Amino acid sequence: MGAGGRTDVPPANRKSEVDPLKRVPFEKPQFSLSQIKKAIPPHCFQRSVLRSFSYVVYDLTIAFCLYYVATHYFHLLPGPLSFRGMAIYWAVQGCILTGVWVIAHECGHHAFSDYQLLDDIVGLILHSALLVPYFSWKYSHRRHHSNTGSLERDEVFVPKQKSCIKWYSKYLNNPPGRVLTLAVTLTLGWPLYLALNVSGRPYDRFACHYDPYGPIYSDRERLQIYISDAGVLAVVYGLFRLAMAKGLAWVVCVYGVPLLVVNGFLVLITFLQHTHPALPHYTSSEWDWLRGALATVDRDYGILNKVFHNITDTHVAHHLFSTMPHYHAMEATKAIKPILGEYYRFDETPFVKAMWREARECIYVEPDQSTESKGVFWYNNKL
């Protein structure tokens, strides 16, 4: 069923069957990727153009209704109520547009339909509308999926080893410092990553998602980076014309603040998917693709799980089979949990509490001195 009447099967036993802070096994698993795939009903890998588009229409319809109410009725309310109404609009519209962002992300994984060209067209339009360079991020994100959990080759939120921690980190390792760090990360983290590769893997020269000739991309990808840049510039020009016609404040209130919410949730979701005290990271001496893909965690965002198309609570399955559409990921997660066993981690900690805990506990990674596996690194916070 489409977006208007979902019949997804929830994962069995939503409460964690094991302590979510218990370390995930780091030894090579006894199961293979093909065994995991065989446990999933075949229809979960089928992509439907109509069903996928139903979610696009559903999200955009809600977004338009919110915009219409905010721009046509809120100004009629008394001052304090008008401001409260706009605050609600910013939060709700930001959440809905995060769902749109997730659909565009699926297009980049070829999980929207069986037609790569259609996926790229839809993804380019939706991501450009949110000022995301579609192909640029598609290619760097693909490398993230190919190297998840690798300390040398993963693309984003690569944890630092203790020897690489900045001198000022100890001064931020306190409640006020964490508030400041989280505020900057959630508001500026996404644009800084795209423009300056902040929190990304190190390259031998300056890396930028807008640079077709940057080290992130190969020669055959450069033309599509130009297309991504053109898409973002077209939207920026459209926003400029809107600002000239309606005023800058109107554009900021209607579009800019919800976009900040989108960017904040994007960073938070990614951070919490790959940052957890129970998750290992690996150097090249230990890393392999399957263990890296399993070094992620499913989270519980309450009702926002559905708003975000379950990218939050089916992320393990997504890393194993990224071309699977989101509307089958819940059923697939239920199917693979018995096979994954302790390699599967679901943490039901409320996401705000989890954000604070991870910011406090996960400052750097280091090998566990009690084991002989020196290529396996775990989070620590002792500065």
Curated annotation (Swiss-Prot):
PANTHER family: OMEGA-6 FATTY ACID DESATURASE, CHLOROPLASTIC. It comes from Glycine max. This is Omega-6 fatty acid desaturase, endoplasmic reticulum isozyme 2. One of its GO terms (biological process) is unsaturated fatty acid biosynthetic process. One of its GO terms (molecular function) is omega-6 fatty acid desaturase activity. It is found in: Endoplasmic reticulum membrane. It holds the Pfam family DUF3474. Its EC number is 1.14.19.-. Keywords: Endoplasmic reticulum, Fatty acid biosynthesis, Fatty acid metabolism, Lipid biosynthesis, Lipid metabolism, Membrane, Oxidoreductase, Transmembrane, Transmembrane helix. It is a multi-pass membrane protein. InterPro entries: FA_desaturase_dom, FAS_N, Fatty_acid_desaturase. A motif (Histidine box-1) lies at residues 105-109. ER (microsomal) omega-6 fatty acid desaturase introduces the second double bond in the biosynthesis of 18:3 fatty acids, important constituents of plant membranes. It is thought to use cytochrome b5 as an electron donor and to act on fatty acids esterified to phosphatidylcholine and, possibly, other phospholipids. A motif (Histidine box-2) lies at residues 141-145. GO terms for cellular component: endoplasmic reticulum membrane. Pathway: Lipid metabolism; polyunsaturated fatty acid biosynthesis. The chain crosses the membrane at residues 61-81, 85-105, 117-137, 179-199, 225-245, 249-269. The histidine box domains may contain the active site and/or be involved in metal ion binding.
